[in-house]
Each structure stands twice: as structure tokens, then as C-alpha cells.
Swiss-Prot record:
Residues 314-559 form the CoA carboxyltransferase C-terminal domain. Component of the acetyl coenzyme A carboxylase (ACC) complex. Biotin carboxylase (BC) catalyzes the carboxylation of biotin on its carrier protein (BCCP) and then the CO(2) group is transferred by the transcarboxylase to acetyl-CoA to form malonyl-CoA. Its cofactor is Zn(2+). Residues 39-559 are annotated as: Carboxyltransferase. The keyword Nucleotide-binding applies. This is Acetyl-coenzyme A carboxylase carboxyl transferase subunits beta/alpha.
């Protein structure tokens, strides 16, 4: 929560020297107010009395309203890093007043006063450290220093930190708190947006994880550069992020904005941030992300059982069954969902949300975790087990935002060199007016093109329904498997019956004609293997089904991870090239490049663009 702003305070803008984003001093940073001569503070959110020592022990979070108070650089480092692990990174001094700027006071005087009042040299600092033993380079901002504004020195601190992360191949964590670019440095301050963005681009090219922690507030030039370019964006509860401030927008468009506008909660719904993390959970969330940020050269899953028993590859070993019965079995609500499987077969799974454009689609979940110790990216459609969950999850039918979210996470997997696992249980892509307005067809097509050249292993499993292009958009893979009671088809049996038989009641006949069941699809070569289900089906024994799925995935990854990028992409393209031709066409290798023969442990994102 934040104190309500009542007017734009010119003195606050003058003091901080940030760009005019339309945020007031009270809206920018409500701080706990100290009662004179007392160890008690007043909460900046709800106004309740806070005992200072207890407030500090609880991470400067109000126990009554969960308001997250601002933190200094040192407080932030103490919260996040392992004890005694922080090692400051020196940044050479640069000219702090390139324009010799004076308004009502000389800029150099403002800098001198900010240094005296905060004990800091500038609004940002860089350190090396560890989080739960995972090495990380951290750049932290402090709003107390001229509103955390972005000037030449702050830009240099960030860029030096990014370059250090690049040299040491260490993840970069940025903690932002800023009102925007520093006006007293003019166009030099503006150029820091380009300079810092360029530095993050180099980390992308090198395959190094970047994480941004958004704290309140993060606006203007910082929001429009390094704060939002990270691979993963975490926000503290209530933290606000935006380019223009609320008041500027309201005055421009003459509309009253939602109460939660630009808050972390608003941004999560609108696809901008991956997760909201209370302070007490930050270290654990960051440690999980850092632990799965790259795959070791020896990262091959162990085979706990016999692969030939985990997956059936000969259709004659599968019993014939009625296709309509398979359709009905695939739709049973008790079948495990993607999140169920993630909880049962993965360690340290962290869900990532949002398409970074406009929305988060709850019908498609994505994230990073570890399978038998091997870091992986997992994507899957999500239905649910109750009527309320089905409605919330859009009955497992992804919108364009869902497919764009999956593409974002697949590109991240390619950058980090992580194998991709997709789990598919959907009647198809969501058919609606908004979906068409947002280019549903384009989103599906772009996923297909992306997956065709993804330079990491991809394993797809149809766990329930595999409906048309909406399913295929996650199933362009090196290895395509399906559960024994799953189905996969160009159209639903009911839809086919209505169109071709002119009678929806002919759905059982249409299902048989479409050959939607596992045995027929294995015989046709559409799938590479079938995962047997326990007696009674996956819904009768979710844990047993998950164990079989885990073993099947282990076997597939053990086969695929040793292959280099050229082999992977060539084989994947050849697999899909041969459908519909009597004689398989010769495989066409990807265009030659300098890293065409690199192993999967080498990082490359060029093939995903």
C-alpha cells in the first residue's frame, strides 16, 4: 500500500532531479515516520505503530498490512546475500556534472548533499556475492540518493556489473528503485538507457541469466531500459513500475485509472512481471532460479529403470481399443494437469508468467525446474479438476498471450541451453473474438517456426487431449510421446461429425475414422512412443502415471542431450518433413554458422530468431 498523493510537489522534482513522470514525493516513497524520541515508527501504508527493532527483523514489512518499506543498499544486500559473501566492485570515478548544470542550486551541491545525507557515493552500487551458495553479481539502487535517478555514474555502475557478469559467466541480479533519468545530466543521462540495454544484450548473446527485482518505485528511464529487459522479472508486493506516472496519464487521457494501476499485482495480470515475491520468500525464489540457470556438461538424467519398459514404440504391443473410449478417457477431469506433473516429477519448479506485452494466459503454464537434477524448461496447457478452475484456466485453451508466453520461455531455454519439455492436454487454441483480434493464428505459426529451429532438445508429451493446431504449437519436438489414454487429432470428433457427417451424434464414428488413439498414431508415425498408464488410467493413479512419465522423459533426454545443435535441428526438421510423402525427403541441414557444430552446452539464440 502507498500514501495517496494529493498534488505534484515541485520541490520534490527539483530535489531529486528526475524526469517529469508525474509522480509525487509521497507517492514515490512513503517512508516509516518516526515518533519523536521513540523507538516506534508509523507504517507508511496503514499508519499503524511499528516497533523499530521488530520491524527491522521482519525485513521492514508491516505485519498488519504487508506494506514493504524502502530499503537501503546495505539492508537489501543483507536480506538477499549469504552472510559475509558480499564483495564490493569498484567503479572508477567519472565526471558527475557533465553539463555544469545549475537550476535554483548547482547540481554539484545537490550531489554533495545527497552523499552527506545517505553515506553513498551514488544511487547504485555493485557487488559480487552468493545466494544459497549460487554466485551472482548484484546491482542495487537506493532511492534516497536523488530519487534513484539514472545518470552517467549509475549507468556506469550497472554496465560494469553486466560486464563483470559476462567475464565471469555469472548471473546478474538488478534491484531497482528509481524515479527515472536524471535531468541535471541532460542527454548524457538519456544515453544511459541505450548503454545499459546494450549491456544486457551482450549477456543474452552469451547465454547468461539476468533477473530483475522491481521495488517501489521504478519509473521512467530505468523502467524503460534495464529494469524490464531481464530474463525473469520479480516484483515486491505493491511495487509500482511504469514509464509515465499515474498523474501524467490521468491528466493526458482525462480518465480515472484503476486503483491498482501500475502496481505489481496489475502488472502480473497484464503479463509484465513473472512473479510477485514477499521479502521473506525472495532468497528462496532467487536461489531456485539461480540453481537452474544453466546445464552442466555432465547434465544427463540418470536411468532409474528400463527405458524399453517406460515407452512402447511398437504399435503391435498395444491393445486395440475403441477410439471413442479413448476420447472419453482423455477428457476425464481426474487426469493429472501440467502443474500436477510439475509438482510430482520436478525439483525447484518456478512458474514464469506473462507474454511481456499485454497479458498472462492461465490456460498455459511455463517455468524452470530440474528433472533428476537436470535443469529444464517446462511448458504445458492447464485445465483443472473443478468447474471454477476450468473456467479460470479457460478450459485449457490458450490465448495468443499463452503461446507468446511459451515462446518467451522457449527462447530463454535456448539462451541458457536448457532442454524443453511440453505437456499437452487441450481441446485446441481458444476460439474467441479477442483471440482473433490478438492474432491467434500468428501466435501459433510463430511458435511452429520457433520450435523448428530451437537449438536445444525438445520433448513433447500429449497427456490428454491433443487438439489441432493449438496442440501442435507445443508439439513440434525431437521426440513426441503420448499417454496410452490420450488422443491427438486435426479436429475434435464432434466437430468432424458435425461438418462431414452433418450429425454430431456421429462423433464415435468420426473418432474411429480420424484414428485419434495412441495405437493408430504410433502406427502412423505421428508419435514416437506411448507411455502406458496404470490400471484404471492416469486419473486412477496420478502418482503412478507421473512416475512413468518421469522415466519416459529421462530416457528421451538421455538420447537427445548428447547431440549437438546441428544434429538436433536437422533430425527434427527431417522428422516433420517426411509427413505425407511416400518416400522420405533427404534431411536438410541448417545454414552453416560459426557455432553450427557446438554441443548443447554451448549457448546460442540465433536459431530462435
Amino acid at each position: 500500500m502507498t500514501l495517496e498523493a494529493t498534488a505534484i510537489e515541485a520541490t520534490a522534482i527539483e530535489a531529486t532531479g528526475i524526469e517529469a513522470t508525474g509522480i509525487t514525493a509521497t507517492a514515490i516513497e512513503p517512508t516509516p515516520r518516526r515518533s519523536p524520541g521513540s523507538s516506534w515508527l508509523l507504517c507508511g501504508g496503514c499508519g499503524t505503530m511499528l516497533y523499530e527493532r521488530r520491524f527491522a527483523r521482519e525485513g521492514r514489512v508491516c505485519a498488519d498490512c504487508s506494506w514493504h518499506a524502502p530499503m537501503t543498499i546495505q539492508q537489501r544486500l543483507d536480506l538477499l546475500l549469504d552472510a559475509d559473501s558480499a564483495r564490493p566492485v569498484d567503479v572508477p570515478a567519472i565526471d558527475g556534472d557533465p553539463l555544469e548544470f545549475t537550476d535554483t542550486r548547482p547540481y554539484r551541491d545537490r550531489l554533495r548533499d545527497a552523499r552527506a545525507s545517505t553515506g553513498l557515493d551514488e544511487a547504485a552500487a555493485c557487488v559480487r556475492g552468493t545466494i544459497d551458495g549460487n554466485p551472482v553479481v548484484v546491482v542495487v539502487m537506493d532511492f534516497r540518493f536523488l530519487g534513484g535517478s539514472l545518470g552517467a555514474t549509475v549507468g556506469e555502475v550497472f554496465t560494469r556489473g553486466a560486464e563483470l557478469a559476462l567475464r565471469e559467466r555469472t548471473p546478474l541480479l538488478t534491484v531497482t528503485a528509481s524515479g527515472g533519468a536524471r535531468m541535471q545530466e541532460g542527454a548524457i543521462a538519456l544515453m544511459q538507457m541505450a548503454k545499459t540495454s546494450q549491456a544486457l544484450g551482450q549477456l543474452d548473446e552469451a547465454g547468461i541469466l539476468t533477473v530483475s527485482l522491481i521495488t517501489d518505485p521504478t519509473f521512467g528511464g530505468v523502467a524503460a531500459s534495464f529494469a524490464t529487459l531481464a530474463d525473469v522479472i520479480i516484483a515486491e508486493p505493491g511495487a509500482r513500475l511504469g514509464f509515465a506516472g499515474r498523474r501524467v496519464i490521468e491528466q493526458t487521457i482525462r480518465q480515472t485509472l484503476p486503483e491498482d494501476f501500475q502496481t505489481a499485482e496489475f502488472l502480473l495480470t497484464h503479463g509484465v512481471v513473472d512473479l510477485i515475491s514477499p521479502r521473506r520468500e525472495l532468497r528462496a525464489n532467487l536461489a531456485r532460479l539461480l540453481s537452474v540457470s544453466s546445464r552442466r556438461a555432465d547434465g544427463i538424467p540418470r536411468q532409474a529403470g528400463r527405458p524399453d519398459r517406460a515407452v512402447v514404440t511398437d504399435p503391435e504391443q498395444l491393445a486395440r481399443r475403441d477410439a471413442w473410449e479413448s476420447v472419453r478417457a482423455a477428457r476425464r477431469l481426474g487426469r493429472p494437469t501440467t502443474l500436477d506433473y510439475a509438482a510430482m516429477i520436478l525439483e525447484d519448479f518456478t512458474e514464469l508468467r506473462g507474454d511481456r506485452m499485454s497479458a498472462d494466459c492461465p490456460a498455459l503454464v511455463a517455468g524452470l525446474g530440474r528433472l533428476d537434477g537436470v535443469p529444464v524448461a517446462v511448458l504445458g496447457t492447464q485445465k483443472g479438476h473443478t468447474a471454477d478452475e476450468l473456467r479460470y484456466r479457460n478450459f485449457g485453451m490458450p490465448t495468443p498471450a499463452g503461446y507468446r508466453k511459451s515462446a518467451r520461455v522457449m527462447r530463454l531455454a535456448a539462451k541458457l541451453g536448457l532442454p524443453v519439455i511440453t505437456l499437452i492436454d487441450t481441446a485446441g487454441a481458444y476460439p474467441g473474438v479477442e483471440a482473433e483480434e490478438q492474432a491467434q493464428a500468428v501466435a501459433i505459426a510463430e511458435n511452429l517456426r520457433l520450435m523448428a529451429g530451437l537449438p536445444v532438445p525438445v520433448v513433447a508429451v500429449v497427456t490428454g487431449e491433443g487438439g489441432s493446431g493449438g496442440a501442435l504449437a507445443l508439439a513440434f519436438a525431437d521426440r513426441v510421446l503420448m499417454c496410452a489414454n490420450a488422443v491427438y487429432s486435426v479436429i475434435s470428433a464432434e466437430g468432424c461429425a458435425a461438418i462431414l457427417w452433418k450429425n454430431p451424434a456421429a462423433a464415435p464414428t468420426a473418432a474411429a475414422a480420424l484414428r485419434v488413439d495412441a495405437r493408430e498414431l504410433l502406427r502412423l508415425g505421428v508419435v514416437d512412443g506411448v507411455i502406458p498408464e496404470p490400471d484404471g488410467g492416469a486419473d486412477a493413479d496420478p502418482a503412478g502415471t507421473a512416475a512413468r512419465l518421469r522415466e519416459a522423459l529421462r530416457g528421451a533426454l538421455a538420447d537427445l542431450l548428447p547431440l549437438d545443435q546441428m544434429n538436433l535441428v536437422t533430425r527434427r526438421r527431417a522428422r516433420f518433413r517426411q509427413f505425407g510423402v511416400a518416400t522420405p525427403a533427404p534431411a536438410t541441414a541448417p545454414a552453416a554458422s560459426d557455432d553450427a557444430h557446438e554441443s548443447q552446452t554451448d549457448r546460442s539464440v540465433e536459431a530462435t530468431r
